[in-house]
């Protein structure tokens, strides 16, 4: 049996988990502890890196102890320590990776530095036993990407955002409308009573031959609409949220439908092609329904891990560690690994800089 302790501190969740795998049996999440920092950041309308790092320092040792206790294991039972080493907020990454190094050194265990995005990319194999290859749509506060997942450590980025991540667009929209943080669930809640036809917002990149995403123009359109009808009433806010959400769903549908067609052409022999959606934005019911419909039309299986494993967690980091151990891909120099605020899964893909574009989102 392989048991790995995972640690995740890349943003505003302090998390630790123990995941086990025995032979050909399904993997087991023995513990999965996540401490959210929403209350600490709510007053600022977004994550403050310094506050996040200090909160990780205060909480991580207790979270690791709780994960071990809940799993019924001790460090002697653990085969390796896996920790997120990037991408993310560098202060939080330092806290998590240095803690993992200390634990691994003291216990005499291997240290596996894990790419946070790889954790998301491999979660469907933890929850659904999915076989390679498959298509991944990663939609979170920091990333919006489409990747072909061909194997452990083998990823092809087919699309990314050329400006804002989708989760960031949700958060900024919420802030403009006076909705509390986090923006995603509050925009979705307000949209439930809104008229999605009242405002005609742009569908960024729709119809473009370029495969990438863009959300800055949509965010600007929301601000202009809100400014034009100030002061905003509750129904105005609901209508803007519903119209914004509809525009996002349409834009995603256009980008993802192209990716599904490309996947079918690139991997024609795949028996059960699948689209996996991961990241916090994957919790949005309108977006999920849109993607499920697309998959049904294209003959793809739609896979969305449970919400607690879609958002940031340490079980996915522990599982990525297990996957790498099984493939003999654990770093020989894990203790020398330094945190990376930007760390693309597909190192071959060109950075999205130039031609009027802002810097790459990992």
Curated annotation (Swiss-Prot):
Superkingdom field: Bacteria
Task of the protein: Required for the formation of a threonylcarbamoyl group on adenosine at position 37 (t(6)A37) in tRNAs that read codons beginning with adenine. Is involved in the transfer of the threonylcarbamoyl moiety of threonylcarbamoyl-AMP (TC-AMP) to the N6 group of A37, together with TsaE and TsaB. TsaD likely plays a direct catalytic role in this reaction.
Substrates-to-products reaction catalysed: L-threonylcarbamoyladenylate + adenosine(37) in tRNA = N(6)-L-threonylcarbamoyladenosine(37) in tRNA + AMP + H(+)
An annotated Gene Ontology molecular function: N(6)-L-threonylcarbamoyladenine synthase activity
Pfam families named among the record's database cross-references: TsaD
Protein's UniProt name: tRNA N6-adenosine threonylcarbamoyltransferase
Details of cofactor binding: Binds 1 Fe(2+) ion per subunit.
Binding site for Fe cation: 116, 120, 312
GO biological process: tRNA threonylcarbamoyladenosine modification
Cofactor(s) of this protein: Fe(2+)
EC number from the UniProt entry: 2.3.1.234
UniProt similarity note: Belongs to the KAE1 / TsaD family.
Species this protein is from: Mesorhizobium japonicum (strain LMG 29417 / CECT 9101 / MAFF 303099)
InterPro entries: ATPase_NBD, Gcp-like_dom, KAE1/TsaD, TsaD
Coiled coil: none
Residues binding substrate, per UniProt: 138-142, 171, 184, 284
A GO CC term attached to the entry: cytoplasm
Principal location: cytoplasm
